[in-house]
Structures are given as structure tokens and as C-alpha cells.
Design a protein with these regions (language model features):
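Short aromatic-enriched loop/helix-cap "lid" or pocket-rim segments at secondary-structure transitions
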Residues: 35-41, 128-129, 165, 174-177
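Phosphate-coordination/substrate-recognition cap region in phosphate-metabolizing enzymes
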Residues: 1-67
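A mid-sequence, solvent-exposed acidic-amphipathic segment
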Residues: 83-113
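Beta-strand elements within well-structured catalytic alpha/beta cores of enzymes
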Residues: 1-2, 112-118
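Domain-level recognition of soluble alpha/beta enzyme cores
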Residues: 134-159
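Short glycine/proline- and acidic residue-enriched helix-loop micro-motifs
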Residues: 52-92
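Acidic, His/Gly-rich catalytic cores of divalent-metal-dependent hydrolytic chemistry
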Residues: 160-183
Length: 183
């Protein structure tokens, strides 16, 4: 199951299975949240003074300021302090992801190996949900997720357990470490 954006990536992953890969299914529920929309909606909720204090004009060139602003915007989104007609509310994002995971478990059944290719926001949300952590922690986990990392879930008919989070065993070699990135 993949988000719509990653069909080519899924095809490359499937090649590694040498003929045993399950069919690729595009699942829009695993699409990442729209961070640009969240950022701009949050920015519109601030006064000009608050924007200046946050360093709005320099965000594109200052990574630290950008990260700080993005974290504030994401917290406001999770707390339902910002909304826009075209923006999925946090509750909808969370429900879409957790509902889809539950549906996959039901429809696929036990003892299956499935691969879901998605992004940090989705992964952080799933991990926080499984661990009984707050929505804020789910967003915080998002910032920690490496590109190309592995998060492994083990599931049965009645529960899901986290087996690995943010693993990079496939990149843990000196000649590949430069490939370890965020966002």
C-alpha cells in the first residue's frame, strides 16, 4: 500500500522481492498532510507583529527559524487552532490513517508481509497512536523520521505492535551514510 505520490518508489521496492512482491495498491489515506497549506494558514492567523517576530521573511533561508515556525504551525493544527476549507483537520488526518491501518489488518488477514511507503507525518501518527501517546508526540515523531527509514509493525487479528521505528539497517554502512536525510 502506498500513498499516491510514491508509485515509482514502490515499483523499485517491489523489484527487490524478485517475483514474490504483492501487487502495488495506491492508498490515498497514506498521503502526507499539506505542510504548505498548514504553514500559510497558520501565518494568516498571526498578526503582522507576530509574523515579524517569528522571522517570516527569513524562513526560506533560515532552516532553524523555518523548523520552529513549522512546529508551531503543526501544534496549532493538532489543537484545531487553525482551519481552512481546503485543509484536512488533524482529527480527520488521524482518523483516516488509523482507520486505514485497521481496515488493512481486517482485509489482509494474519501472517502477511505488507509494505506501506509513506511519509513522516503518517508514520509519526501511526506510532503515537499504537503507543498510546499524544497527538503532539505524533507530530514530534514526524520531525525525527529519516527519509528511507523502516518502521515495522506486527499485527494479529486484535492488536498491532511496534517492532521497529525509524530503522536504517539498509543504509548503515560507511559508503551509504550520506544518504541518511530528513524531509
Amino acid at each position: 500500500f502506498i500513498r499516491a505520490f510514491e508509485k515509482v518508489q514502490a515499483e523499485l521496492i517491489a523489484e527487490a522481492f524478485t517475483g514474490t512482491a504483492p501487487p502495488i495498491a495506491i492508498e490515498p489515506a497514506f498521503n502526507e498532510y499539506d505542510s504548505d497549506l498548514i504553514l500559510h494558514t497558520f501565518a494568516r492567523s498571526l498578526t503582522p507583529e507576530q509574523l515579524a517576530e517569528a522571522g517570516w521573511p527569513e524562513l526560506k533561508s533560515d532552516r532553524r527559524r523555518f523548523q520552529f515556525f513549522l512546529e508551531r504551525a503543526a501544534r496549532a493544527w493538532v489543537e484545531a487552532q487553525i482551519e481552512a476549507e481546503e485543509m484536512t483537520p488533524w482529527r480527520g488526518f488521524h482518523g483516516r490513517i488509523t482507520g486505514t491501518i485497521a481496515n488493512i489488518m481486517r482485509t489482509e488477514g494474519r501472517s502477511k508481509t505488507l509494505i506501506v511507503s509513506t511519509s513522516g507525518g503518517v508514520i509519526g501518527t501511526i506510532v503515537a497512536h499504537l503507543m498510546g501517546l499524544s497527538n503532539h508526540i505524533g507530530i514530534e515523531l514526524n520531525w525525527a523520521v529519516h527519509n528511507a527509514s523502516i518502521t515495522r509493525l506486527i499485527y494479529s487479528a486484535d492488536k498491532v505492535s511496534l517492532s521497529m521505528f525509524n530503522g536504517l539497517p539498509h543504509l548503515d554502512r560507511a559508503e551509504l551514510r550520506h544518504l541518511i536525510t530528513y524531509r
